[in-house]
């Protein structure tokens, strides 16, 4: 269980090369080792030298040191191993003749610090210069200027020059001396390999890669402490705690950890707290096993109980947060009260203090699912809970307990008692047997790996192989919980044998299947390119959303969008439903952009929404491919969004119709539904002011959603070519009077239907007032007629206009304005 460590955020696992070398004899360079790890299935996201930003710094001896009058500066003669000493001006108060310090030579690179001499502000190059008239040919350095902290090197935290050992060789590079030449590997560990979430776990793999033996960390100790008579451990929830080990340590002396331990913890992102606490954090990184130390004086009843929490039972954890628990949470209790939230964090009431004299060390295996769910439900995460959630093996639990006791003895901070209790130890830490055939293993790989190589590889991975003809028997260590069947054996063989041995071949299907995109992919690409040409960016969101997203839209309970599929095991409640609309995520995206200072923009997403045919599910849902478009900004409006929707239609060589509509989340007078061939396929409109306010939007926003699956029949449609007429076009302006309920779209449609010679209809004026009467309005249109085979006559065009007016009157009650 994690203490309040001063740890920085680490996205993967940091592995110092120097720590690895304690367990494996590594005789290759760091970069070569990185390549070997990568070729064996480990993603090394980054590798770097600890002192990568430091160069040109050597050991210097100050031979003379004289103060510069009326300043805090000193002028020094510094021997750096050259023919003549260098003259360097220095303002540190701990500089003196006879002292050895790091010297940055001319052209060297070190870290630049702020006025507090602690905060790093980038790097700087050292140049020759003058201070108060004195030439200065270099710089004497502090620990901070070399990127060091007190945990990385003793004395580096002092606000002055870093004092080097008296036996440091003058003129030598300081990197090896200060261990700045160490390397760090930042390794991403996949979910199926929790055994590699530790330095020793990686060391086992490196040993196999280099075909070297791996050295086990020292586990021996002597039981010399006072016994704790009558101490018991009981596990009332064996399904949640397969193994629990408690060991009593007396004569504890809380103090600082040795420099080597503080340095190693610092290299993996953990700050030193005290020797006992550091031991638990050290083992977490070294062996991958979370541990906890209780102050024995606060454990009442001389007992430890592992049980489910009582409903509404409370505990205050080490970070001083109080939690109300339920029976889904596992707790560690003494005879009276909870003293830890199992696998997540210790209790404040039993923490290690400066006055602690006796400690109970805990090493346990907790059910990963329970720890993961408890951590998520309580909103409480720690290094330990994250580790338990990935899985901890029985072997590490036993090994870590012994390692902690060895370190207690090695650091001289306590005496190990013979009081040692293991509970619920029914699960074996011995290897389990697995059988396979060499033929099957090679069949999975598609190549013939020599039997001798298979045996060598499996032996190096500690599988203890026995081969009898074609039969292969291995012993799977307790820490390899990922090994289930012969394909797993094949994977282990090929990653060590080398993927480069596999000859690339085409799939058999590739011989008869032509490459390239299908019609659907080509059409979608055209739509994307067309929208990008209009200044829109593509967005991608999860296929899941939150129940609160449906509330954001203000949808009624019987709305189809509310009939969403709930996931059995969601990542979290915000991603618990399969989305039935793309609008909420687009709204959130618009809000995020505005909050981040992007006050105008256009975004689209092409993705699936999932419409269940019935709930609970009895058959697969209908996956509707959909495009959602969102725009926002001062220059955007309903019509610019309509233009983008029309762009989609134009790309497909079709026309959309727009009819006034109402939606709970869109402006009541700036909303339309989109029709194709009379069927509704989407909508567009402005978000309501309530939603814009709730999402903290500063600019108006508009969204559209179109069902692309409904348009699949027109994918790949080839447009027909109509030759440009060689005859002159004719136009007529029509001022029409109609009821206010008649829409522009209805009028345009009726005009176009009346004559095949109508090429276009454009609205140019709208009037409401006394001249047309109440409940009436006037709209004026320019109608363009295009001849096909001969010139128009005035009489012919007048005839078309009469047909138009008749059709308008019959269908919409529209009349020509007098």
Task: Give the positions of each predicted feature.
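Phosphate-backbone binding interfaces of nucleic-acid-interacting proteins
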Residues: 6-223, 227, 360, 383, ...
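Extended, well-folded interaction surfaces typified by the phenylalanyl-tRNA synthetase beta subunit core
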Residues: 434-599, 732, 784-786, 796-818
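Conserved mixed alpha/beta core segments that line enzyme active sites in large multi-domain catalysts
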Residues: 59-88, 267, 274, 280-349
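Beta-rich nucleic-acid/ligand-interaction surfaces
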Residues: 51-55, 221-224, 511-512, 516, ...
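Glycine/proline-enriched, intrinsically flexible loops and inter-domain linkers
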Residues: 17, 35, 67-69, 210, ...
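Mobile "lid/hinge" segments at catalytic clefts and subdomain interfaces of large enzymes
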Residues: 132-141, 145-147, 156-160, 175, ...
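Terminal amphipathic helices with adjacent charged low-complexity linkers/tails
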Residues: 210-235, 412-441
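A carboxyl-terminal module marker
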Residues: 35, 460-466, 482, 613-617, ...
């Amino acid at each position: 269980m994690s203490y309040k460590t001063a740890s920085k955020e680490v996205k993967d696992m940091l592995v110092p090369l120097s720590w690895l070398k304690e367990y494996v004899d590594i005789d290759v360079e760091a970069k070569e080792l990185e390549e070997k790890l990568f070729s064996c299935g480990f993603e090394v996201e980054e590798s770097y030298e600890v002192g990568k930003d430091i160069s040109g710094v050597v050991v210097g001896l100050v031979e003379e040191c004289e103060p510069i009058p009326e300043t805090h500066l000193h002028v020094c003669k510094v021997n750096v191993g050259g023919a003549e000493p260098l003259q360097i001006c220095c303002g540190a108060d701990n500089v003196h003749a006879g002292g050895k310090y790091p010297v940055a030579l001319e052209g060297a690179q070190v870290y630049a610090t702020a006025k507090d001499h602690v905060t790093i502000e980038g790097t700087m190059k050292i140049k020759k210069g003058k201070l108060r008239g004195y030439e200065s040919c270099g710089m004497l350095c502090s620990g901070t200027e070399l990127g060091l902290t007190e945990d990385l090197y003793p004395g580096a935290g002092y606000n002055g020059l870093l004092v080097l050992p008296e036996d440091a060789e003058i003129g030598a590079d300081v990197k090896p001396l200060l261990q700045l030449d160490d390397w760090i590997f930042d390794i991403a560990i996949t979910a199926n390999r929790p055994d590699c979430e530790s330095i020793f776990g990686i060391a086992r793999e490196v040993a196999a890669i280099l075909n070297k033996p791996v050295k086990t960390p020292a586990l021996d100790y002597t039981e010399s402490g006072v016994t704790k008579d009558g101490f018991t451990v009981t596990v009332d929830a064996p399904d949640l705690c397969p193994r629990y080990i408690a060991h009593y340590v007396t004569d504890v002396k809380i103090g600082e950890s040795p420099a080597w331990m503080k340095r190693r913890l610092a290299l993996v992102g953990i700050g030193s707290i005290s020797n006992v606490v550091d031991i638990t954090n050290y083992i977490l990184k070294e062996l991958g096993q979370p541990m906890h130390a209780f102050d024995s004086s606060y454990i009442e009843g001389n007992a430890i109980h592992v049980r489910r929490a009582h409903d509404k039972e409370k505990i205050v954890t080490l970070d001083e947060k109080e939690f109300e628990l339920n029976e889904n949470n596992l707790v560690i209790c003494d005879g009276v009260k909870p003293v830890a939230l199992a696998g997540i964090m210790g209790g404040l009431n039993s923490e290690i203090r400066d006055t602690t004299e006796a400690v109970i060390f805990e090493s346990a295996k907790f059910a990963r699912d329970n720890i993961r769910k408890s951590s998520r439900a309580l909103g409480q995460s720690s290094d330990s809970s994250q580790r338990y959630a990935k899985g901890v093996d029985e072997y590490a639990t036993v090994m870590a307990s012994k390692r902690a006791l060895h370190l207690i003895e090695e650091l001289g901070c306590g005496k190990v008692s013979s009081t040692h209790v293991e509970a619920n130890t029914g699960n074996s830490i011995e290897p389990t047997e697995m059988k396979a055939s060499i033929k099957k293993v090679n069949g999975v790989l598609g190549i013939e790996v020599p039997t001798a190589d298979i045996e060598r590889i499996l032996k190096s991975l500690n599988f203890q192989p026995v081969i009898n003809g074609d039969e292969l028997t291995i012993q799977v260590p307790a820490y390899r919980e990922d090994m289930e069947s012969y394909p797993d054996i094949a994977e282990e063989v090929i990653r060590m044998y080398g993927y480069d041995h596999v000859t690339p071949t085409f799939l058999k299907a590739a011989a008869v299947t032509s490459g390239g995109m299908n019609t659907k992919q080509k059409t979608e690409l055209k739509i994307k390119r067309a929208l990008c040409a209009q200044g829109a960016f593509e967005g991608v969101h999860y296929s899941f959303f939150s129940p609160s997203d449906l509330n954001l839209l203000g949808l009624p309970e019987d709305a189809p969008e509310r009939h969403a599929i709930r996931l059995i095991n969601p990542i979290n409640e915000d991603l618990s439903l399969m989305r039935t609309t793309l609008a909420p995520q687009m709204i959130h995206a618009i809000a995020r952009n505005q909050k981040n200072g992007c006050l105008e923009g256009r975004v689209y997403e092409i993705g699936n929404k999932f419409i269940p045919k019935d709930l609970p599910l009895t058959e697969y849902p209908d996956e509707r491919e959909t495009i959602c478009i969102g725009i926002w900004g001062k220059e955007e409006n309903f019509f610019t969004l309509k233009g983008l929707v029309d762009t989609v239609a134009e790309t497909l060589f079709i026309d959309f119709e727009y009819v006034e509509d109402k939606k709970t989340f869109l402006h009541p007078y700036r909303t339309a539904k989109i029709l194709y061939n009379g069927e509704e396929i989407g909508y567009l409109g402005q978000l309501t002011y309530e939603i814009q306010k709730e999402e903290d939007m500063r600019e108006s926003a508009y969204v559209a959603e179109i069902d692309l699956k409904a348009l699949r029949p027109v994918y790949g449609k080839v447009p027909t070519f109509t030759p440009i007429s060689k005859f002159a076009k004719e136009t007529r302006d029509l001022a029409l009077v109609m009821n206010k309920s008649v829409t522009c779209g209805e009028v345009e449609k009726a005009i176009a239907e009346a004559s095949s010679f109508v090429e276009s209809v454009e609205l140019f004026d709208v009037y409401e007032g006394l001249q047309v009467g109440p409940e009436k309005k006037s709209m004026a249109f320019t109608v363009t007629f295009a001849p096909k085979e001969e010139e128009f006559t005035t009489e012919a065009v007048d005839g078309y206009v009469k047909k138009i007016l008749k059709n308008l009157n019959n269908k919409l009650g529209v009349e020509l304005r007098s």
